Amino acid sequence: MNKQDVMKLQTCVLKVNVHCEGCKHKVKKQLQKIEGVYSVKADVEQGRVTVTGNIDPALLVKKLSKSGKHAEILGGGGGGGGGGGKGFPNLNGQFANLNMGGNNKPKGGKESNQVKGKAGGGGGGGQNHGHGQPMQLNPQQIQQMMMMKAAHGGGGGGQMKMPPMAAKDQKKSVKFADDEDDEFSEDDYDDEDFSEDDYDDDEFDDDEDDDDEMGHGHGHGGGGGNHMPPNKMMMPNKMMPQMGGHHGNGGGPKGPNEIMMMMNGFKGGGGGGKKGGGGGFEIPVQMKGMGEGKNGKDGKKGKGGEKGKKEGKENKGGGKTGKTDAKSGGGGLLGFFKKGKSGNGDEKKSAGKKDGHGGNKVKSHGGGGGVQHYDSGPKKGGGGTKGGGHGGLDIDELMKHSKGGGGGGNKGNHNHSAKGIGGGPMGPGGPMGPGGPMGQGGPMGMMGPGGPMSMMGPGGPMGPMGGQGGSYPAVQGLPMSGGGGYYPGPPQASQQMNQQQYMQMMMNQQQQQQQQQQAVAHGGYGGGHGGDMYHPMMYARPYPAVNYAHPPPMPPPHSDSYTHMFSDENPGSCSIM
């Protein structure tokens, strides 16, 4: 076999009713006849036949059923060639789809959220949810792949390993919107894996909550939270777990707006969105004045916005939003607005399906925690939750016009990016995108410019640092000045840049003025008295009073010409130059 043939080989595992050596022999013979089959291995005990070659598994099944043997494709199918159980992708196609950057983001087909282990999904992206055996085909592994007995999902480039509970509720997530898959695939940032205690803060985490609430939230929103192994490469500076995952669009956001939350925000609670069962996306509001409101799980650490278990298990019952009795008086948003129990107390309007797209309105007031649950929990359209009020401030009115949190991106805030134009984590409608719950202009554009409550962004109605030049607030331990925040977003970036360049220009201008003035003062014009008429500009050094003698003029350049006469650097010494 030449190299190209090897590259085209696929392994397919068929479940065939093989009872004895005779059957086995017959099946082998049938399969060997098919063009493109390279080797056939039969396992009588398990009733499995492993076929290697450049063939279409559907063809194998067809041939076997003709000869009276019922066959099913177990693994290896799907992937290329359009999903389902059809056509093996050739490996080159897989390499294209594997996205070697380590994102585990199979591009190509819609991420198939099929519950059975039948690998679906196009372009090497079939995720065999049932068999959670990831298999990344590198060129070095091709030979091994040929030898493997049961290569589950030879085709699936990006099959993700899943915790056991993933498959049980997966049925709900078979709906997905096309546009989300390409750019922001939900696997990239899904944090379903945080139930594995990779990044949880153990003290705030109680596992019953996880177990009860996870599994209800898998990807019910716009695009189905597909699952991936904790992918540490994708974490900015490994500082924080992927935040969002479950809010419908999968994909915990990554980006300037949320990095602010890394240092403090995550004291509260567990790797992001994980506990917001039903795919809730909790944003710990407090950062600086963290007080006691640590968003603690069972109110263990002060009832920071989530008192005890969220009753209703995060709207398992649909319209009943999880009560987050945000009573805690501690903290206050960034220590700015301290208000123990907000006026509306625990007013939880269970606005169930009020928004028409199934958005819940969780008003968690309370200075202490104000955890906003962007629950696009079990609602299938990924409805955005109507941005409820946040801690301490009675901003219900402010929030009214930011309906439709970024949940599934289906009605992205402000941007109305209907149908999830950027349904992914950072797209216009996503949880962090320009219209999403925390993006620029989202209901709580926490750092983003222009949200109704954009705490820090320029121009928000309430932004304490609103207005020009206000950058993100400093993260704990950084200066709170204009450039203090991490990664200012583009709008601020431009202002910051302008400021800096402006400062730079001012400095240069001053230096030039200084030099000119010095030149003038040292006899530039009229020897003795020219300089005094030119008053120094901003910070130029003051000149002596008029009636004093001027300092001696600058010495002429190259007074000691011998030093340079034979130096390489003095072109004057050489007539040719």
From Swiss-Prot:
Region Disordered, annotated ranges: 77-136, 150-451
GO cellular component: plasmodesma
Composition-biased stretches (Acidic residues): 178-213
HMA domain residues: 9-72
Regions that span the bilayer: none
Xref: CDD domains: HMA (cd00371)
Record: residues binding a metal cation: 20, 23
Pfam families linked: HMA
Biased composition (Basic and acidic residues): 168-177, 294-326, 344-358
Similarity comment text for this entry: Belongs to the HIPP family.
Protein name as annotated: Heavy metal-associated isoprenylated plant protein 34
Name of the encoding gene: HIPP34
